[in-house]
C-alpha cells in the first residue's frame, strides 16, 4: 500500500545518504595519500577475507565434483561452469541486487556483497586447480598405498597431499595475484576502493594518484611473489 511504499522509499533514501557519507569520508580524507591508503585497506580486507573463505570452499567443491554420486558431481561441475563462464563484474551485480529483487531480502552492505561474489567466483577457480592437482597423481600410487594396507584417508594425507600441493602452487599463486587486482572491480557496486579514490583525484587534475595506486599494487604483489617463490623453494626437495 501507500504507507509501505513510502517507508521503503524513505529507508532507501536513508541508506543512500549513509552510503554516500561513508564514501565521502574515505575519498574526502585530509590528503590524497590518506584517501588512497583508506581505499587500499578495503582492497586488502576484501583480498584476505576472500582467500580465507574461498580456499576451503574450493576444496569442498572439488570433492563434490569428484564424487561418485553423479547428481552431486554434475551439480558441482555445472556450478563451476556457470561461475567460470560469466564475468565477475556481472556476479557482483547479481549478488547485490537479485536477493532484493526476487526474495525481498536485499544485502544492505556492499562490502558483504563484494565478499560473497568474490568468494563464490574464486572458490570455483580454486576447485579446478585442486581437481587438476589431485587427478595428476598417477593411479598407481593409490594402488600402492592399498597394497600396504593403508586406508583412503592415510593414502591421501601421507602420499598424495604433498604431491598435490607441490603441483598446484604455481597456478594457485597466479590466481592469488590475480585476486589482488580483481578487488578493484568492487568499484562497480560503489565500494570505495583505491581506484575509485584515485579516479576522484584524477578528475580534479591530479595524475600522481594513478601512479601511487600502481605502486600500492606492485608492492603488495611483489611481496606475494616473494612469498610463493619461498614456498616453492622450500618444497624443491620433494620432486614430483
Task: For the regions a language model picked out, list residue spans one by one.
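Transmembrane alpha-helices and adjacent helix-loop boundaries
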Residues: 10, 14, 20-240
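Extreme N-terminal basic, low-complexity initiation segments
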Residues: 2-11
Amino acid at each position: 500500500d501507500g504507507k509501505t511504499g513510502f517507508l521503503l522509499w524513505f529507508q532507501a533514501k536513508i541508506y543512500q545518504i549513509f552510503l554516500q557519507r561513508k564514501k565521502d569520508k574515505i575519498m574526502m580524507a585530509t590528503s590524497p595519500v590518506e584517501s588512497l591508503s583508506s581505499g587500499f585497506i578495503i582492497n586488502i580486507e576484501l583480498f584476505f577475507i576472500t582467500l580465507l573463505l574461498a580456499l576451503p570452499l574450493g576444496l569442498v567443491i572439488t570433492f563434490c565434483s569428484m564424487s561418485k554420486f553423479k547428481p552431486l558431481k554434475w551439480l558441482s561441475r555445472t556450478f563451476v561452469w556457470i561461475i567460470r563462464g560469466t564475468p565477475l563484474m556481472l556476479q557482483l551485480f547479481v549478488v547485490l541486487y537479485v536477493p532484493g529483487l526476487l526474495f525481498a531480502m536485499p544485502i544492505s552492505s556492499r562490502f558483504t556483497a563484494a565478499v560473497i561474489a568474490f568468494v563464490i567466483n574464486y572458490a570455483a577457480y580454486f576447485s579446478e586447480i585442486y581437481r587438476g592437482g589431485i587427478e595428476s597423481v598417477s593411479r598407481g600410487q593409490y594402488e600402492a598405498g592399498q597394497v600396504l594396507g593403508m586406508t583412503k584417508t592415510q593414502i591421501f594425507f601421507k602420499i598424495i597431499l604433498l604431491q598435490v600441493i607441490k603441483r598446484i602452487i604455481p597456478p594457485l599463486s597466479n590466481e592469488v595475484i590475480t585476486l589482488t587486482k580483481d578487488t578493484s572491480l568492487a568499484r562497480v557496486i560503489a565500494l570505495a576502493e583505491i581506484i575509485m579514490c584515485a579516479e576522484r583525484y584524477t578528475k580534479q587534475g591530479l595524475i600522481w594518484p594513478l601512479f601511487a595506486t600502481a605502486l600500492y599494487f606492485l608492492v603488495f604483489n611483489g611481496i606475494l611473489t616473494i612469498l610463493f617463490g619461498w614456498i616453492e623453494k622450500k618444497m624443491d626437495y620433494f620432486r614430483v
